[in-house]
């Protein structure tokens, strides 16, 4: 048995969906432990493109149990839409389980999220506008609604009437928006409760039952380390904890249940939204990475900012998450470049620094210190083993492994499942007997 956490080692969008899908073949249970519909992952199976925001990637395997844990925030309308989409593609998701204690995103959360972001003006954060921050805010203020509350219409009415009245005051007085009709909202969410009732369970109990039965459990994070509320580039972060420790809180397990942690990182770096980005590129190189990598957000459709691989934030992600190994994705995007740069340190106010600064103003002043490596200028898309890779591509991977001080277990060379090199099974294989410098 092995219980594994998969996290993003950058600013999200690293390709965790594909890696989780790949690892789900060896998992009995897959748990999504934080985030909401602000995250998205794309899976390509036999040329079929599936885009999911809430449902774990493991749903494509009929023998894998998928759980949406307590640390997530659930938009029931989106969840029902994903279930319908899967059904239309002949994928059975009837076994999906949603934590009864997961908090619910409501219409006023979305409206407030969008209004607050607009009001920030030049200080905007880059929120997706899906209501995630306000949902987590209500959770922290102990005024939120949980999935279990949707199952009892009378309780739902009691729990919603006060908050709707209070949020309507905010919408009207602060933002000049029309108020919500309380009866319409209550009726809508009572209907969601009826339609989702068969999926709502005590997920923490289900996870511990699986652990006692010595099942393989895969914990799937959303977003990435640098978007973590406590450890990311605050305030340009999400409202939850994507780091490995967040799996324990969001799933309701102790750290001793986790056997290993896998970090997913692109062979370059991207970021959506606002905030400092030391290795960001502009012009034709940025356009090349964006076009070759299809760098447009699954959730928002926004173009992602692109830059060179940043080893400083990479090492920080290794430390914060206790990474055992890495999955490097989109190596093929670099195939046509004659030179590739990698950030190995920063220069801050004339001093070389090797660490990620906690101060946002300091991080904004950091200039990258690059090392330049030769490109391989040949396609890697059809490579299926390390021996198939060009030597310069292998040298690049070894350089990243040495820089990050952690071995590489998986190399992804395209969106499809088969465009993958598994150096060593990161679930069942020996720790650290993988690709390293």
Swiss-Prot record:
**UniProt cofactor(s):** Mg(2+)
State where Mg(2+) binds: 13, 40
Q: Among its keywords, does the record have Cytoplasm?
A: yes
Reported EC number(s) for this entry are 6.3.4.4
The pathway where this protein functions is: Purine metabolism; AMP biosynthesis via de novo pathway; AMP from IMP: step 1/2
Provide any one GO MF term from the record. magnesium ion binding
Domain of life, per the record?
Answer: Bacteria
Q: Where does GTP bind?
A: 12-18, 40-42, 304, 330-332, 412-414
Q: How is the cofactor bound?
A: Binds 1 Mg(2+) ion per subunit.
Primary localization: cytoplasm
Q: Which Gene3D superfamilies match?
A: Adenylosuccinate Synthetase, subunit A, domain 1, Adenylosuccinate Synthetase, subunit A, domain 2, Adenylosuccinate Synthetase, subunit A, domain 3
Q: Can you tell me which residues form the catalytic site? A: 13 (proton acceptor), 41 (proton donor)
- Check the record and name the NCBIfam families matching this protein: PRK01117.1 (NF002223), purA (TIGR00184)
- Quote the subunit structure annotation: Homodimer.
Function of the molecule: Plays an important role in the de novo pathway of purine nucleotide biosynthesis. Catalyzes the first committed step in the biosynthesis of AMP from IMP.
What protein name applies here?
A: Adenylosuccinate synthetase
Q: Which organism is it from?
A: Synechococcus sp. (strain RCC307)
């Amino acid at each position: 048995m092995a219980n594994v956490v998969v996290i993003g080692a950058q600013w999200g969008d690293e390709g965790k969906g594909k890696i989780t899908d790949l690892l789900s073949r060896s998992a009995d249970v897959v748990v999504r432990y934080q985030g909401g519909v602000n995250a998205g992952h794309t899976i390509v199976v036999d040329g079929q493109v599936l885009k999911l925001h809430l449902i774990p990637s493991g749903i494509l395997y009929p023998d894998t149990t998928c759980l949406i844990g307590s640390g997530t925030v659930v938009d029931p309308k989106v969840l029902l839409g994903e279930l319908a989409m899967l059904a239309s593609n002949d994928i059975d998701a009837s076994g999906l389980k949603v934590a009864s204690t997961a908090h619910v995103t409501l219409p006023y959360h979305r409206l407030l999220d969008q209004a607050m972001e607009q009001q920030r003006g030049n200080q905007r954060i880059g929120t997706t506008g899906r209501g995630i921050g306000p949902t987590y805010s209500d959770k922290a203020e102990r005024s939120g609604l949980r999935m279990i509350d949707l199952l009892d219409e009378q309780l739902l009415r009691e729990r919603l009437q006060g908050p709707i009245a209070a949020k309507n005051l905010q919408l009207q007085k602060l933002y000049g928006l029309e108020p919500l009709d309380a009866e319409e909202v209550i009726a809508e969410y009572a209907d969601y409760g009826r339609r989702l009732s068969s999926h709502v369970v005590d997920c923490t109990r289900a996870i511990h039952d699986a652990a006692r039965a010595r099942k393989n459990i895969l914990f799937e994070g959303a977003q990435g380390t640098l978007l973590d509320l406590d450890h990311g580039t605050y305030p340009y972060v999400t409202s939850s904890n994507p780091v490995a420790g967040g799996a324990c809180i969001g799933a309701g397990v102790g750290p001793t249940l986790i056997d290993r942690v896998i970090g997913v990182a692109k062979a370059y770096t991207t970021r959506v939204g606002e905030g400092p980005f030391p290795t960001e590129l502009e012009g034709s190189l940025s356009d090349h990475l964006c076009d070759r990598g299809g760098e447009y957000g699954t959730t928002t459709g926004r173009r992602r900012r692109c830059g060179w691989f940043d080893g400083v934030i990479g090492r920080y992600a290794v430390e914060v998450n206790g990474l055992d190994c890495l999955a490097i994705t989109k190596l093929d995007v670099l195939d046509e470049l004659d030179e590739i740069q990698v950030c190995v340190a920063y220069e801050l106010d004339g001093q070389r620094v090797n660490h990620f600064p906690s101060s946002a103003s300091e991080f904004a002043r950091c200039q990258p210190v690059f090392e330049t490596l030769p490109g391989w200028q040949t396609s890697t898309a059809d490579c299926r083993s390390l021996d198939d890779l060009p030597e310069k591509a292998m040298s690049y991977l070894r350089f990243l492994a040495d820089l990050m001080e952690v071995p590489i277990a998986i190399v992804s060379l395209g969106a499809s499942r088969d465009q993958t090199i598994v150096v060593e099974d990161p679930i069942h294989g020996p720790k650290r007997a993988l690709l390293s410098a």
